[in-house]
Amino acid sequence: MKERLEKLVKFMDENSIDRVFIAKPVNVYYFSGTSPLGGGYIIVDGDEATLYVPELEYEMAKEESKLPVVKFKKFDEIYEILKNTETLGIEGTLSYSMVENFKEKSNVKEFKKIDDVIKDLRIIKTKEEIEIIEKACEIADKAVMAAIEEITEGKREREVAAKVEYLMKMNGAEKPAFDTIIASGHRSALPHGVASDKRIERGDLVVIDLGALYNHYNSDITRTIVVGSPNEKQREIYEIVLEAQKRAVEAAKPGMTAKELDSIAREIIKEYGYGDYFIHSLGHGVGLEIHEWPRISQYDETVLKEGMVITIEPGIYIPKLGGVRIEDTVLITENGAKRLTKTERELL
């Protein structure tokens, strides 16, 4: 964490930023090692960083934080600390009202966004971060296999989701990384078809998309199955998505752009005549947030680098018929890509 702070301070020097105010919880955790439930804020002044927390969070923050911790009773104390700051570095997510309050109550003259330097830091994972994500992926692998076993004719989607979310917690997850998607039948054509009260029927395609939050880091995996035997159309679109996903994983490597990686899977799906049914980007970064940089899309020119963790998740979604998505969390390595989620992909 010392190295992270040093890079932030260097950015401040290069951009004539006097102080930095960090409020987004995942960024507070990234720089301090703690994420107070009741709120916490980091102020960087010169090369010194301090974590400010409400009184009720003080004892826990003191135990966990790698930064000095100071408690406050009223936010006015924060305004006072930042009084007469010429240039304040802030995150783009900071609310308009808080910016206005800093102008009025702290007399801040100018604001500069610090999102780019934080993105550049967080986009490359350390060895320790990768090990945590690998554990989160291990939990997700166990959960997706349990979901496959749980899915039977007549069972409600929510029943399956509840059981796998319980299993993830029993295996060490803090909670699901996001609302578990169990989307069956016509609902499998909904990319974000979170589990509903719909009963699963024989012949349904079922998209299972889940992830585990473990020690603050996320995992993400999707598998698609059929209840019973697949028909010709279901098998066709499954094989196309599987080919696109495998080819993209095999091709991913440092030096290529996110756009180039997206196009590998997208062109395969287009060649089979289903380009209009692949309606989202190929993937996204995974880390402290379930969706973070880079965006693996047809518009993103980000160059892939060793240490990035991304998802590769092509899909085909045909309204009224159903959909197929196959997704893995993948680590970009020196020589290519390594699947961190390892559940069998050939499930039809």
Swiss-Prot record:
A biological process term (GO) from this entry: proteolysis
Amino-acid positions noted as binding Co(2+) 1 in the UniProt annotation, renumbered to this chain: 220, 284, 313, 327
Top-level division of the source organism's lineage: Archaea
Function according to Swiss-Prot or TrEMBL: Splits dipeptides with a prolyl in the C-terminal position and a nonpolar amino acid at the N-terminal position.
Name of the protein in its database record: Xaa-Pro dipeptidase
Keyword Metal-binding set for record: yes
PROSITE patterns, alphabetized: PROLINE_PEPTIDASE
Record's keyword terms, sorted: Cobalt, Cytoplasm, Dipeptidase, Hydrolase, Metal-binding, Metalloprotease, Protease
Note from the entry: Cobalt 1 is the tight-binding and cobalt 2 is the loose-binding metal center.
Cofactors demanded by this protein: Co(2+); Mn(2+)
Recorded effect of pH on activity: Optimum pH is 7.0.
Location, primary (coarse class): cytoplasm
Residues engaged in binding Co(2+) 2: 209, 220, 327
Stated family: Belongs to the peptidase M24B family. Archaeal-type prolidase subfamily.
SUPFAM superfamilies: Creatinase/aminopeptidase, Creatinase/prolidase N-terminal domain
Cofactor, free-text remark: Binds 2 cobalt ions per subunit. Co(2+) can be replaced by Mn(2+), resulting in a 25% decrease in activity, but not by Mg(2+), Ca(2+), Fe(2+), Zn(2+), Cu(2+), or Ni(2+).
A Gene Ontology term for the protein's cellular component: cytoplasm
Gene name per UniProt: pepQ
Consequence of changing residue 284 to A/L: 2000-fold reduction in activity
